[in-house]
């Protein structure tokens, strides 16, 4: 029976088929390109170039023929359009960069290409990664494959929708305040945001430099581990990249997946694992359907040998105001470079130089980006810097300290990714505050720089996916992936696909 993308359940399955010559990288690429074309209504991709993709696939086949293949050689992947890519336009979902072509590849793209992965195209996203629904893109909103009248989550919504719909077996994403975890939850896939600095930011178009972090999005923890092997590691071109002395050593995350815990048994592989449940994550605001799915998943973890422990993260409610001071402040600085002079959109008609700046930025940026630039400029202005920005940084430190206290009582923290399942397209666009509140459970992890992931754990209202959030201590990606993998070995939520 010939290999087909219809039967794909994991990247390992693809890698094994390629190694066994059951399918060639070129044949696989052609099949996924056909799926992308058939799934255009989702609007998950903003750039596809079959010639470039097939050239990479042929190179992967040649590499395998020469005996130089890695576990990822020939495996297709889609890249979020926030990573610059030579040969494809790199737009960050914005009119400002609608025609920008980068002369180089982002380190993440470069490393995965070096492993032999084949780029299928660039995925849609909220403009400059600012959004929770993928409705802020210059190229239009993305639809959720489980219900096309709903959002896929954001800002990595195109990547999430592409993986969920089978248009790509894996994708890259970025997470500033939840932009890998929330769309993974809404779209029923697995995604991990590594410790800040684990994955290079070089070539990632910046939103908030002290928060942005790249990571993989795929169907399973095993897939994410395989991808993280290729993505993680120190990069001298990124000043925020972790050096080996600070934890930037590349681990073999796939090998660690199956490493038995001390005292574990076949029926209880997680014996001795302490799971912290923050009381602030299970109170007012969490919808009943989401909580029901989470409680069932936690009961499964108990069957696997884990112990549930109550912990507290008292400053959780402050994470929204803190984030929406720090992130816009950094965005206003990062986006000041887009002035219509060096690169980016330039207004066709203008008077003097100042008028050109104003018109180019007014035309090039969308409403949400303008809103955040204005907020950021305000909190950094004279008379408000001390009152807002510095105070927010102090509370950020307290939020990080809260996590460290919690980790003295537990090994992994679990809770919801979002208060609800995916909402309807257009439902929250008129009320930015309601949109911001959807990130209440993911922001604090980002502010602390901790690793976090979303794992499918059931379904809620409208038969929409629900994700369980796993949060680890610094550099604890291996334990997070191992914990998620054990759950996925015992359940099949990650194998469910939209009709």
Curated annotation (Swiss-Prot):
Gene3D superfamilies: Amidase signature (AS) domain
Active site location: 80 (charge relay system), 155 (charge relay system), 179 (acyl-ester intermediate)
Keyword ATP-binding among record annotations: yes
SUPFAM superfamilies: Amidase signature (AS) enzymes
GO MF assignments: ATP binding; glutaminyl-tRNA synthase (glutamine-hydrolyzing) activity
This protein's record includes keyword Ligase: yes
GO biological process assignments: translation
Entry GO terms, CC: glutamyl-tRNA(Gln) amidotransferase complex
Subunit-structure text: Heterotrimer of A, B and C subunits.
PANTHER family per UniProt: GLUTAMYL-TRNA(GLN) AMIDOTRANSFERASE SUBUNIT A, TRANSAMIDASE
Role, per record: Allows the formation of correctly charged Gln-tRNA(Gln) through the transamidation of misacylated Glu-tRNA(Gln) in organisms which lack glutaminyl-tRNA synthetase. The reaction takes place in the presence of glutamine and ATP through an activated gamma-phospho-Glu-tRNA(Gln).
Similarity remark: Belongs to the amidase family. GatA subfamily.
Protein name: Glutamyl-tRNA(Gln) amidotransferase subunit A
Organism: Cupriavidus metallidurans (strain ATCC 43123 / DSM 2839 / NBRC 102507 / CH34)
Gene symbol of the encoding locus: gatA
């Amino acid at each position: 029976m010939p290999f087909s993308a219809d039967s794909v359940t994991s990247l390992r399955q693809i890698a094994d088929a390629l190694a066994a010559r059951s399918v060639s990288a070129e044949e696989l690429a052609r099949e996924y390109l056909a799926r992308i074309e058939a799934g255009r209504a989702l609007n998950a991709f903003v750039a596809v170039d079959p010639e470039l993709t097939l050239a990479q696939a042929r190179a992967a086949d040649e590499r395998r023929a020469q005996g130089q293949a890695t576990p990822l050689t020939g495996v297709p992947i889609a890249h979020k359009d926030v990573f610059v890519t030579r040969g494809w336009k790199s737009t960050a979902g914005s009119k400002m960069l609608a025609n920008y072509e980068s002369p180089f590849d982002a380190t993440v793209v470069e490393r995965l290409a070096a492993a032999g992965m084949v780029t299928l195209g660039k995925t849609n996203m909220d403009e400059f990664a600012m959004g929770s629904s993928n409705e802020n893109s210059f190229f239009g909103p993305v639809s959720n494959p489980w219900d096309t009248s709903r959002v896929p989550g954001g800002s990595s919504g195109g990547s999430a929708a592409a993986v969920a719909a089978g248009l790509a077996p894996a994708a890259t994403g970025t997470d500033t305040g939840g932009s890998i975890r929330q769309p993974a939850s809404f779209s029923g896939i697995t995604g991990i945001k590594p410790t800040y600095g684990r994955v290079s930011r070089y070539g990632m178009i910046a939103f908030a430099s002290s928060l942005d972090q790249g990571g993989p999005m795929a169907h399973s923890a095993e897939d994410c581990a395989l991808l993280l092997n290729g993505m993680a590691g120190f990069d001298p071109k990124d000043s925020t990249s972790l050096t080996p002395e600070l934890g930037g050593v590349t681990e073999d995350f796939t090998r660690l997946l199956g490493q038995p815990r001390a005292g574990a048994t076949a029926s209880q592989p997680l014996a001795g694992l302490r799971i912290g449940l923050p009381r602030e994550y299970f109170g007012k605001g969490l919808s009943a359907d989401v909580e029901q799915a989470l409680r069932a998943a936690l009961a499964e973890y108990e069957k696997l040998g884990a112990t549930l422990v109550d912990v507290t993260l008292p400053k959780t409610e402050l994470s929204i105001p803190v984030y929406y001071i720090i992130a816009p402040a950094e965005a206003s600085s990062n986006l000041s470079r887009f002035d219509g002079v060096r690169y980016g959109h330039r207004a066709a008609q203008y008077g003097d130089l100042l008028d050109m700046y104003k018109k180019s930025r007014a035309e090039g940026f969308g409403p949400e980006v303008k809103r955040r630039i204005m907020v950021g400029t305000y909190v950094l202005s004279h008379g408000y810097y001390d009152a807002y920005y510095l105070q927010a940084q102090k509370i950020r430190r307290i939020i990080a300290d809260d996590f460290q206290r919690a980790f003295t009582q537990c090994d992994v923290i679990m809770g919801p990714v979002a208060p609800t399942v995916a909402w309807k397209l257009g439902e929250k666009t008129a009320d930015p505050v309601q949109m911001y509140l959807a990130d209440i459970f993911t922001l604090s992890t980002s502010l602390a720089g901790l690793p976090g992931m979303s794992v499918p754990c059931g379904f809620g209202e409208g038969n929409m996916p629900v994700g369980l959030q796993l949060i680890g201590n610094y550099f604890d990606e291996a334990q997070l992936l191992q914990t998620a993998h054990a759950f996925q070995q015992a359940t099949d939520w990650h194998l469910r696909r939209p009709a």
